[in-house]
């Protein structure tokens, strides 16, 4: 039986993680307490990924082998606390995506200048003829790009929230 991956949050990060999880053959489920944008619903539906919005159904989440948490969900949210209490691994979309690519990752974080620096590095790589993707807080999620493209490099803008739930420091 396939490993069950639950993604909490169905924005850019969560939807991208779901696409990659499904492509890797996982039993994939997405849950979002808010309304999911139609474009993300379409992305999930086109790939046969189950999802729910406006709630977190415990019976569909607490049976996960691993959870990918979107960066906007606080670490002290009730569902996160329940998952932690039962020992379910909780990771970020960035860490999950890093498992499925051999691309080199150039990650930019900090208080000021992230977007400018990330864009500048991306454009330098692109102009140099490198096969490069732009991810993180800019453009499509890293997980989506890993699922759909085959880049040699990724230039990634990371907020402090996106650094949460990354255990494998070698990923970034």
Task: Name what the model sees in each region.
Residues 1-92, 96:
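N-terminal leader/targeting and accessory segments in enzymes
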Residues 23, 59-62, 71-172:
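Phosphate-binding loop of NTP-binding sites
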């Amino acid at each position: 039986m396939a490993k069950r991956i639950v993604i909490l949050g169905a924005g850019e990060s969560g939807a991208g993680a779901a696409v990659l999880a499904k492509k890797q053959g996982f039993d994939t489920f997405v849950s979002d307490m808010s309304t999911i944008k139609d474009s993300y619903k379409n992305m999930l539906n086109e790939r046969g990924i189950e999802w729910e919005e406006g709630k977190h159904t415990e019976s569909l989440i607490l049976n996960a082998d691993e959870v990918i948490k979107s960066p906007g969900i606080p670490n002290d949210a009730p569902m996160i606390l329940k998952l932690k209490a039962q020992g379910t691994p909780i990771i970020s979309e960035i860490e999950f995506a890093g498992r499925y690519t051999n691309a080199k990752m150039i990650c930019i974080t900090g208080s000021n200048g992230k977007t400018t620096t990330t864009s500048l590095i991306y454009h330098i790589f692109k102009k140099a003829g490198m096969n490069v993707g732009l991810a993180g807080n800019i453009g499509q999620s890293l997980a989506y790009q890993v699922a759909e493209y085959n880049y040699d490099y990724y230039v990634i803008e990371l907020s402090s929230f996106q650094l949460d739930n990354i255990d494998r420091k070698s990923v970034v």
